């Protein structure tokens, strides 16, 4: 033994501090209970390795080391300091203490064979020490990075959902602050090429049989599945950039490599019986089994549907209307996060998807949410107004109507919205994008709903039917407006005059009569109108367009209302009846003017002579007597007339046309008034009576001549 001791020089001795990892006060306080427990386990494991190498170190020293760390934690709680400001100072102090203790705690290495030279013994011990220390550092680094990623995921979900969801316990139990990995030593040169993968573990400990543990392709399980490109990339043979040095296996994401490396460094106690693969952590086995057996161990609080991964469930709960920016081109499925999008390959290979029993639609999870469309179940109720919803996401969006929250703001105009989908559709106004095109006429629309309504023009579909009269409509709002004609409901009331309307648009147009607003101006003559429809019909005067044609006689009209009135000449329809005398009229204004003959009302008075009339057209004609205006001129003889009807009758003197024929004697006349006077010859009717002597005449002109005999007037 003495000779063997002489082979190793004093400077080759290795102490516990060479391979153990120490924390400062600030660093220790940042660790939670689980992280501190893992630290103790790793420290004890390090002690076991040192003992196996023949280095003398009592277990009480290790325990005292851990107790000192606990004392540091209590001291920090009593007198907290800013860990960022003192981190460098503590690091330097630790290096000084470590240097002093290396001089006073030398341990003799005696297990190397006598045939081995001292330099080889020293190299083995130093290599093992470096590997143990590196394993310890990387194990703790993995723990911190895992917590950081989970905590970042929780913050992201809470930010997007606005606190509207309860996250799984895996995320909700995380501390509000976590230590960073900047305080850990850098990996050695053996893994510098993978520096971007901060969680990489390069630990070369062999299994119990002295051989490297084999990692089968389809039997891997990793604790952070959300950060992987998923097993689908590995199964399809896609090349992975991260390679584990010991086993030669390639992994498709850094966190996969991180956890995969642990299978070579700690005891493997959980066995997956399907593939004979051993897993170093129970979480790995728990998440491995659903891959083989299709079992789901995480349940959705909203729909009671189950998922195979807890973090997958978080993203399932996050999904909602308009919140799915990632889309799979193979199945046109949309996802709220890129990690879910990469999961699509696994979902697409599912052999037994969930199928709705009522409509046959298939789902990969959360089928019960869809079934609520059939059952009408709405379990999520607003506490303020009592309105219910089938999904919790819809309730979160609805509650923003009460709070006024609009978290999605347009960068161009500053307008805010309650949903991201509404912001996306709004931005099309600025970009001019119209992604929805009609395949029939190639017309494009900003919104898909507008395209659906437009396509009903081509198909003639009118899915909204009135239950009272059976009339159908292509849009739902048209049916709602139509029903008000049956109920008499007029919910839109003018605040100035109290007049009510069945449509909001009619109220808006009516209010312009009070304000005098006429926003629609003709580019040709400058005339303005309160409605766009009136401007369109006015412009037909300039263009001469008459798009409405009578199918009976071929006559055309500028306005559809004129065509409707004209068609009553052919049908003989007179829908407007006088309640006093029973006389009927084809137009409403004719009935209004007729009623004035019973009441004697003459609201239209001439400002020149004071004569009054019961119709506005009569006043207009009368005013032409004072002005002498005769705007209607004959093209053949240049004779002018005050009325267009006079010009039409005059032109028949040139053409010889006599379209009005007596049915009794066959005599024809150029004007309808002449035919009417002629009919009185056959009927004996004399409607014009003298008020002085009671004598009657067939024509008004005959009465005028007769009255001169009483007045003595000489024309």
UniProtKB/Swiss-Prot annotation:
Q: Which InterPro entries match?
A: KRAB, KRAB_dom_sf, Znf-C2H2_ZIC1-5/GLI1-3-like, Znf_C2H2_sf, Znf_C2H2_type
Q: Does the keyword Zinc-finger apply?
A: yes
- Annotated protein name in UniProt: Zinc finger protein 544
User: Which sites are covalently linked via Glycyl lysine isopeptide (Lys-Gly) (interchain with G-Cter in SUMO2)?
Assistant: 273, 289, 534
Q: Which residues form the KRAB domain?
A: 14-85
Cellular component per GO? nucleus
Gene Ontology biological-process entries: regulation of transcription by RNA polymerase II
Q: Where are the transmembrane segments?
A: none
Question: What are the record keywords, sorted?
Answer: DNA-binding, Isopeptide bond, Metal-binding, Nucleus, Repeat, Transcription, Transcription regulation, Ubl conjugation, Zinc, Zinc-finger
Q: Where are the annotated C2H2-type zinc-finger regions?
A: 354-374, 380-402, 408-430, 436-458, 464-486, 492-514, 520-542, 548-570, 576-598, 604-626, 632-654, 660-682, 688-710
An example molecular function term from Gene Ontology annotations = DNA binding
In which family does this protein belong, per the annotation? Belongs to the krueppel C2H2-type zinc-finger protein family.
